[in-house]
Amino acid sequence: SMYDGGIEKIVNVCASVGGFQDTVDLMEKYPFIYGAVGIHPDDADKMTQETLDEIRRLSHMDKMVAIGEIGLDYYWHKEEEEHQIQKKMFRAQLDIAREEKLPFMIHSREAAEDTLNIVREYMQGGMYGGIIHCFSYSREIAAEYLKMGLYLGIGGVVTFKNAKKLKETVQYAPLSQLVLETDCPYMSPEPNRGKRNSSLNLPYVAQAIAELKGITAEEVIDVTRQNAEKLLGIHQ
């Protein structure tokens, strides 16, 4: 049903401690599914050296194309001590991305400044590119990431009426630095907002970007596919 819906390739992104095997199983079962391995900041306090070793080991798999979803989330985590643990684990996973020559996928919520500072520091030391997943900050912050040659992940939120900030960012950002994503099962685009999300909803996202940029949805789909393939080293 993915092919019929125009979806050629999917990157399934790990997030939780204990969730790696699900991604590995999907990658092995479906030729069109690739993986990203990493731990979301919500689980940073559950991470051990074994977790990091496992991320590194799985990153060697042929179809594992990125380290993610990694980053900082201060929305639910208000304590400075929690922030320190998140930053430590974020850096540890960026180290793996650098050493294994893989791009990263970043989650950042209510942590704009700290995320930007850490990413900037790593990019200056040389990295293999990355995606700021589900980008939600201002155009000014987008500009900083775009200057570093990073990509912005755009999902269902761009179709929401109240997503003024994101729409401005999408108008401003070059199409050559955007990729499409779902954040499944969350963030379903209009007209399916509130329902379980799936990759089959991506045409709505492409259409919204096309309208904001005054181009066709076909062009959005074509260019964002090429962007993702180039960054992630996935070839036809």
Please tell me what each predicted stretch does.
Residues S1-Q236:
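Mid-domain alpha/beta scaffold segments of enzyme catalytic cores
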